[in-house]
Regions:
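Conserved, well-ordered alpha-helix/loop/beta-strand core segments that scaffold catalytic motifs
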Residues: 151, 155-184
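Conserved, mostly hydrophobic/aromatic
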Residues: 13, 110, 169, 179, ...
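Single conserved hydrophobic/aromatic residue that forms the stacking wall/gate
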Residues: 2-9
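Structural preference for beta-strand elements that scaffold enzyme active sites
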Residues: 10, 173-177, 255-257
């Protein structure tokens, strides 16, 4: 970390969640998972899960000044799959999936179903999957267990590397400031699993979505489209989802920034069928 040699004592890291719509980590499929794109493939070589030739010569786009996310995601996914096939479960891995099962199992299942449905939003899935019918989910798990295990493996690798990074930063006197986006994405495991905590009706459609009033960015305001929280439902649940989210973030960062202030200071509750804020 070169920041250590410039006497910098804090490093602010933008949202580290998986990217979703428009390659944005602020429309993430999970409020808890880590972004597979941040996994260092060379560390997988050191673990014997990949060979150097697997990585060398890869083409990630023609313009080095921009990121071709489509190519990067495709290449990374292919290499992570290859590493997964070489991976042998060990004590550390089993401890991780047990400790993180409270969010990891839902996320891995969500991503496996999403993959099976050509990455379409969960709102377009078959009714039994949308409404999480236990017998249908159990059958899917049995049939697609390897896909579910793959997503567990990816998260294990992300968090293993992240923890090493944080330990190294802290050892060098650098604290990490990390983001928590104020809203969850509609197309996320969080909303799919916990629709009653959001402004979602009985047909699993959003009723009110997030945005802000007109400002110098837009004369019609900003319409973000994230479902709002049902704070009454959150209160009845003891704010468990939010407390778990903050507790999880505090294990990854030294300080947490909720992004951003305007989103909960002057937010709008916008009808879901509106075209502007």
């Amino acid at each position: 970390l070169h920041t250590a040699y410039r006497r910098q004592r804090q490093m602010c890291i933008r949202d580290r969640h998986p990217t979703g719509y428009a390659d944005s980590p602020y429309q993430s499929p999970s409020a808890f998972a880590g972004n597979p794109l941040l996994i260092d493939l060379w560390e997988l070589v050191e673990l014997g899960l990949l060979a150097p030739d697997d990585i060398k010569g890869r083409e990630y786009g023609e313009d080095p000044s921009t990121v071709d996310y489509e190519k990067v995601i495709a290449q990374k996914k292919e290499l992570l799959r290859k590493a997964f096939f070489s991976f042998k479960e060990d004590v550390s891995y089993l401890a991780f999936i047990q400790e993180q099962s409270w969010w990891l199992e839902d996320y891995a299942l969500f991503m496996a179903i999403k993959q099976h449905n050509e990455l379409r939003s969960w709102m377009t899935w078959d009714k039994e999957l949308r409404f999480r019918k236990p017998e249908v989910l159990a059958a899917f798990k049995e049939e697609h267990i390897e896909d579910i295990k793959f997503h567990r493996f990816v998260q294990y690798m992300f968090f293993t590397q992240w923890n090493k990074l944080k330990a190294y930063a802290n050892k060098n006197g650098i604290s990490i400031i990390g983001d928590i986006p104020i809203y969850a994405a509609m197309d996320s495991a969080d909303v799919w699993v916990n629709p009653k905590l959001f402004t979602i009706d009985i047909s699993l459609r959003p009723t009110l979505v997030a945005g802000v009033p007109p400002d110098y960015f837009s004369p019609t305001g900003q319409l973000w489209g994230n479902p709002l929280y049902d704070w009454d439902a959150m209160e009845r649940d003891g704010y468990n989802w939010w407390l778990s989210r903050i507790d999880h973030a505090m294990k990854l960062y030294d300080m947490v920034r909720i992004d951003h202030f305007r989103a909960f200071d002057t937010y709008y509750a916008i009808p879901a069928d509106a075209t502007t804020a």
